[in-house]
Amino acid sequence: MKKRIKELTDLLNRYRYDYYTKDAPSVSDSDYDKLYRELVTLEQSYPEYVLQDSPTQQVGGTILKGFEKYRHQYPLFSLQDAFSREELDAFDKRVKAEFPNATYLAELKIDGLSISLSYENGFLQVGATRGDGNIGENITENIKKIKDIPHQLSEPLTITVRGEAYMSRQSFKAINEARQENGETEFANPRNAAAGTLRQLDTSVVAKRQLATFLYQEASPTARNQQNEVLAELAGLGFSVNPYYQLTSSMDEIWDFIKTIEAKRDQLAYDIDGVVIKVNSLAMQEELGFTVKAPRWAIAYKFPAEEKEAEILSVDWTVGRTGVVTPTANLTPVQLAGTTVSRATLHNVDYIAEKDIRIGDTVIVYKAGDIIPAVLNVVMSKRNQQEVMLIPKLCPSCGSELVHFEDEVALRCINPLCPSLIQRSLEHFASRDAMNITGLGPAIVEKLFLAGFVHDVADIYQLTKENFMQLDGIKEKSADKLLAAIEASKSNSAEKLLFGLGIRHIGSKVSRLILEVYGDISALLTAKEEEIARIDGLGSTIAQSLTQYFEQKTAAILVDELKTAGVNMHYSGQKVNSDAALFGLTVVLTGKLNQLNRNEAKDKLEALGAKVTGSVSKKTDLVIAGSDAGSKLEKAKSLGIRIEDEDWLRQL
C-alpha cells in the first residue's frame, strides 16, 4: 500500500502541475477524480504512509467524499414565469388591486445556479444548493472557493442570503478550449459548466474555474423595509450585487427597462435569461404571500427563446400516469440553446388542430422556458405535401378507445389496467421527489411489470431477490442494492408517499402543506373537502381532487397494504395544529405591546395556527392592537375587521 500511495501522489501532483501551472490538463476531470478518491481512501486506511507532498495535504484543494443533504431553514421558492407584456400587466393588476401605491424593483435574471449562504456572527457557516427548495446539498467547501463570496462579513450578523452563482462567458470559453484540446466533451453552455463546477469533489477545480456570484435576497428576517434597501445592505456587507436594476411603479417603465436590457444582453459578461420584477415593499411582499409554488409578489419575465426550423418526420403518442396521451414530434436534428434537439412536444390534440400541424411540415422549434423543446408553429410557405396528422382513436398501449372530454385539451385513456398508465404510475412512485427508490427507473419498472411481479405501487414492497434475479441484466449485487433502496424508502416522511400516489393536482409542495396539518396519510381517508380547502396555499380544486381519491375503496385498500408492508404513514416535519384557536387566520400586529415584545407575540400567534402579516387588507381576519396604534387600526375599522388587544392574546 505504501508503494501505491507513492505512485498516486506522484501521478496526481503531475496532473495538478499540468492543470494549474501549464494550464494544459493532461487527464479528464473524471479520471483525476477517481484517482484522487483512491488516494484518499488509502490514506484514511494507512495514515502512517501519507506523504507531505500529497495533493490531499495541499492548501487550496480538498477532496470531498460527496455532498450531504441540507434542509433550508427558509425555503426557496420558484418564480412564476411571464413571456409577454400582457402577463406582466395581469401581474400588475393583481398587485395594484391589493396595494394601489405599490412600486416594483426590476432586476436581471442571471442564468446560473441558485445558492443559499448562511452566516453566524458574520462568519460563513453553510453554502448550499437550492435542491427542491426545502432540501439542497451542502457545498460549503466549494462555495469558499468562489472569490467574491466573503468568508467574513463587514458586520457580525447572523443572516441567510440568496443569490446566483454563474460562470462568465470569458471563463466558459477558456474552459471549453482547454477541454477541446484535451479531447474532453465541451460544456453546452455557461450554466451547465457552473453546475458541473459546483458539484466538483476536488475544490481546487472550483477555484480554477473562477465562478462568480450576484446576491439579491435576505431570506432571514431583516430590518430593511424595501428590496432596494436589501440590495444596498448586501453590497455594504461585501457581497457582489448586480448593478442593473430599476425602481418604478409604472409597468411601462419596466417594459422599457426590459427592452433596454434585452438589446444589450449580448454585451454583458455573463448570461441572463430575463428580468425579475418584485414588489419593492417587504411588508407588501409578506402580505401578498405565496402560492404553493411561487411568491405572489414577484414574476420572472423570460426573454423570447431561440428558434430554429426543423422538419417533422413522425409522431409518437405516449400515455402518462394520469392517462393523458401526449404527442411528441420526431424532427430533423437542430442545434438549439447549446444542445442537439431531435424531439419536441406537440402538447395535445387541440394544439395540433389549432396549428394545423402535419407530418412532413417544416416547423419552428424553440425551448419552452429554455428547457423543453416544443413546436411553435408551421412554416406554411414551406408546406409541400398534404399528409394530415393521424390522431389515434385507440390507446397506443392497451388498445382501449380514447376519450376527449369537453373541458380538456388532451386525449385520455381511462382504462385503469392500461399497461403504460400503470408503468408510469410506478415510475412516478419511485422517482426522486416521491419515494426516491434509487435504481428503480423506467427500464427496470417495465421488466418487473412485464414479468408480472408488480401491478400497483404496493407490489413494490413485496418484491424479492429472486424476482429481480429473474430479470434480464440484473445481477445479485444490483438486486441487493434495489432491495436496500426499497427498504430505505419505507422510512420516508409521509409527504413523499402522498406525492408518490400520483393524485391529480397534488404536487410535492402541496403534499407537504397537507401533511403539516393532518400529520398522517390515514387521516386523509376521512378528511373533509372544506377543511382541506382552508389550508393556506390550497383551494377547492386541490381539496376536491384529494377527497375524491381517498373516498375510493381502492385507496383505503392501497393505504392498508402499504402500512402492512411497513411504509411510514407519518409526517416527520413540524405539524400545524388544525385545532389551534387561530388556525387559518391571517393576523396583523399593530401599535406598542406592553407585556410581550413583537417577536414573542408573533411566535404565540403562529403557535396558535395564525399567519402573521405586516399590513392590513381585505384578506386580514384579525388585528391585535396595542397602544398608539395608527393607520393599520383605522384601516381595520374601515374594513370591518375583528380587533382584539394584547390582554386578549395573552389569555389564549
From Swiss-Prot:
Keywords of this entry: DNA damage, DNA repair, DNA replication, Ligase, Magnesium, Manganese, Metal-binding, NAD, Zinc
Q: Name one GO molecular function term.
A: DNA binding
Q: Which SMART domains match?
A: BRCT, HhH1, LIGANc
Q: Which residues form the BRCT domain?
A: 577-652
User: What are the binding positions for NAD(+) in this chain?
Assistant: 29-33, 78-79, 107, 130, 164, 278, 302
Gene3D superfamilies to which the protein is assigned, alphabetical: 5' to 3' exonuclease, C-terminal subdomain, 6.20.10.30, BRCT domain, DNA ligase/mRNA capping enzyme, Helix hairpin bin, Nucleic acid-binding proteins
Q: What is its EC number?
A: 6.5.1.2
Database matches in SUPFAM superfamilies:
BRCT domain, DNA ligase/mRNA capping enzyme, catalytic domain, Nucleic acid-binding proteins, RuvA domain 2-like
Q: What class of enzyme is it?
A: ligase
According to its UniProt entry, one GO biological process term is: DNA repair
Q: What reaction gets catalysed by this protein?
A: NAD(+) + (deoxyribonucleotide)n-3'-hydroxyl + 5'-phospho-(deoxyribonucleotide)m = (deoxyribonucleotide)n+m + AMP + beta-nicotinamide D-nucleotide
Record-linked InterPro entries: BRCT_dom, BRCT_dom_sf, DisA/LigA_HHH, DNA_ligase, DNA_ligase_AS, DNA_ligase_CS, DNAligase_adenylation, DNAligase_N
Cofactor(s) needed for function: Mg(2+); Mn(2+)
Do the record's keywords include Cytoplasm?
A: no
Q: Which CDD domains match?
A: BRCT_DNA_ligase_like (cd17748), LIGANc (cd00114)
Which residues are responsible for catalysis? 109
Q: Name one GO cellular component term.
A: cytosol
The free-text function statement in the UniProt record for this protein reads: DNA ligase that catalyzes the formation of phosphodiester linkages between 5'-phosphoryl and 3'-hydroxyl groups in double-stranded DNA using NAD as a coenzyme and as the energy source for the reaction. It is essential for DNA replication and repair of damaged DNA.
NCBIfam families in the record, alphabetically? Answer: dnlj, PRK07956.1
Q: Which family does it belong to?
A: Belongs to the NAD-dependent DNA ligase family. LigA subfamily.
Q: What is this protein called?
A: DNA ligase
Q: Which organism is it from?
A: Streptococcus pyogenes serotype M12 (strain MGAS2096)
